[in-house]
C-alpha cells in the first residue's frame, strides 16, 4: 500500500467541491441562520465523551499551541484526536457555507423571503472568510508535515516504543490512524531497502539495526538534552488549589519545582514567566499542559 502525505492531508480538501443544489433548496434552518460573520463552522460543538462545550476560538487557540509545541519539541508529541476531529468537521462545515454563499444559494433564499440579495460590494466578508479558512488549513498542514518528518526520523525508535510493554504511552495515543499506516509502510520500505542494499552482504552478527549494547546507539532517539524556551501556564483546567505540584515560592508566587539532574539543583518555575531549560527537565510538565514551548 502506497501512502504519502497527500493521503493524510486529503481530508482538508474533500469538502471544497461544488455543493449539490438539491440539498440546498430544501430550506434547512441550519443553513439560513448562518451569515458571513461565522468564523469556522457552527459555534456549537459538543465532545461526545465529556459533553463539554468547546468554542471555535478555543479550538483554534489549542491548535496554535499544539503547532508551536510540535515544532519546538525534539520528540513526537501525542496526537490531539478530539481537537483534530472537531477542526476538520468545522472546516467541512465552513467550506460548505462559503460554497453556498459564492454560488448564490443564500441570495436565492433571501429573495424568496422578501429580503434583498447580497450586493456585490458586500462580498468582502466572504473573501475574509475564505482567507481565514485557508490560514487554518495552512497551520494544520504545517502541523501534520512536522509530525511526519519526525515519524520519518524516529522510525526505529517508534517501532521499539511500540514493542516495549513497559512504555508509558501506546502508539495509538501517540499517532493518528493515518499516521500509523504511514509509519508502518515507511518503516517496512526503509528496512527492505537497507536489507537488500547492505545488511544481507554483511556477517549475520552485524545485521542487527537496533543494537543498543555498543558504544553507539543505532536507534536514533530524540535529543532529550535540547534546550527549549518555555512559558509556564499553570494548571490547564484553572484548578490551582487541586494541583499537587503547584507550590508558592518565597515571594508568595505560585510556581513549579523541577530538578536539573546534571547539577542536582532544584529550580522554581514561576507561573507566567519564561525560561530556557533542557527538554528532559520540563517534559512531564509539557505533557500535562502546564507549560508551553515558544
Swiss-Prot record:
Pfam families: Sld5 (PF05916), SLD5_C (PF16922). Its main location: nucleus. One of its GO terms (cellular component) is nucleus. Changing residue 67 to R: In sld5-12; temperature-sensitive mutant. Defective in DNA replication. Changing residue 66 to P: Defective in DNA replication. Belongs to the GINS4/SLD5 family. Required for DNA replication. Functions as part of the GINS complex which plays an essential role in the initiation of DNA replication by binding to DNA replication origins and facilitating the assembly of the DNA replication machinery. PANTHER family: DNA REPLICATION COMPLEX GINS PROTEIN SLD5, SLD5 PROTEIN. This is DNA replication complex GINS protein SLD5. The gene is SLD5.
